Amino acid sequence: MAKVRFRISMSLDGFTSGPEQSVENPLGIGGEGLHEWAIELASWRRPHGLEGGEVNASTAVMEESLAGIGATIMGRNMFGGHPGPWDPARPWKGWWGANPPFHHPVFVVTHHARPPLALEGGTTFTFVTADIEEALAQARRAAQGRDVAVAGGASIAQAYLKAGLVDEMEISLAPILLGGGEGLFDGVGALPELKLVRTVVAPGVTHYKFARRG
């Protein structure tokens, strides 16, 4: 059966972004350090339309996280743009340019309705104003039997974790302290249904994969 998979980079003190996030600084102060391990990987650069890159112990982790995904769910904060209702005078299309790295349907959970946004490379953003269960139902239909990825940010990840809807979770732990920002596990509580199944130590990061028991 197709799975719901979640992967995110996190600091040692549990944050997935730094403090003082803004449109100008979407990762917050120091937040770029969460992803330094990834951005030079060949397996990260390829779906972004970039050539070259490194191959190391993180390569297989990244390739595995991208393989078999048929649809992605994210929150409004990850998609970005100014908060509140969408501004037709400033038609925000995400952080990723004309050809985003997803190359499949993406469902953005938001309080504000907006028509679907089709971009190059097979990525279409659909804006879901219903609950997370409806967003997942739409993503499953679009994925056509493949897995669904929950991309973040922290608040949407928390919602799916608290609802017990995540089958696999990959935490890429970066050796930095942010001191504030979005805490991944704020209000989530224990997750007894998930067990550690793999640990990979790589340059600048340690990857922990958890899977549903049974």
Language-model regions: role of each:
Residues 1-214:
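Enzymes that bind and transform nitrogen-containing heteroaromatic metabolites
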